[in-house]
Design a protein with these regions (language model features):
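N-terminal beta1-alpha1 cap of cysteine-dependent amidohydrolase-like domains
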Residues: 1, 13-111, 119-127, 131-168, ...
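Bacterial N-terminal signal peptides
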Residues: 2-10
């Protein structure tokens, strides 16, 4: 009897199409298309005045791509001159979203700028401008497709297939991770 009840419970819980609420730090049509399905509610935190009211609903948070992160967020005054547009409101919002997701163990994804913000919010730093700080033969801001190979330092088979030591990455960035937090 116990096994029968357990199987019914598992079967019933697997059949539920529970709605999941995903909070985007700043929405765009591409993110909405990527996430859109019948079981997902997408909330754009950037357009909501009281973000505390939506944080309690979050099943996941996505920090999206966008403007440069203010170098003052990682104590860098030198790179202020080479940064593009800085959105102070967004920097503050994404730190709040990161802290909430981290403290509450809510799944968190960072895309482009979002991944950089995750690094900064964890205590890391960024290259404010990759070409001027480390030099590169890769043109990061040309028109068209911008991809190049990078060499992997950690070739963990948990993330990449065995034997993988290089991967292709998007290069439409002039900022990148510099120091990773411990």
């Amino acid at each position: 009897k116990t096994i029968f009840i357990l199987i019914i419970t598992i079967f019933c819980s697997c059949q539920k199409n529970e709605l999941k609420t995903i909070i985007l730090s700043k929405s765009s049509e591409n993110y909405v298309k990527w996430m859109e399905n019948d079981n997902t509610i997408i909330l754009d935190a950037y357009t909501i005045k009281n973000t505390d009211s939506i944080l309690v609903l979050a099943d996941g948070v996505i920090l999206t791509g966008g403007e440069d992160i203010n170098p003052l967020q990682y104590n860098d005054t030198i790179n202020l001159a080479v940064c593009g547009d800085i959105n102070y409101q967004r920097d503050i919002l994404e730190r709040k979203l990161f802290d909430f997701a981290f403290e509450n163990k809510i799944p968190l994804i960072g895309v482009c700028r979002g991944m950089q913000m995750m690094n900064v919010a964890s205590g890391g730093t960024l290259y404010g401008d990759i070409p001027s700080e480390i030099g590169t033969t890769v043109i990061h801001r040309n028109n068209g497709e911008v991809n190049h190979k990078i060499v992997l330092v950690d070739t963990s088979s948990l993330i990449f297939p065995n034997g993988t030591d290089t991967i292709m990455v998007n290069s439409w960035h002039h900022q990148g991770l510099k120091i990773m937090p411990n």
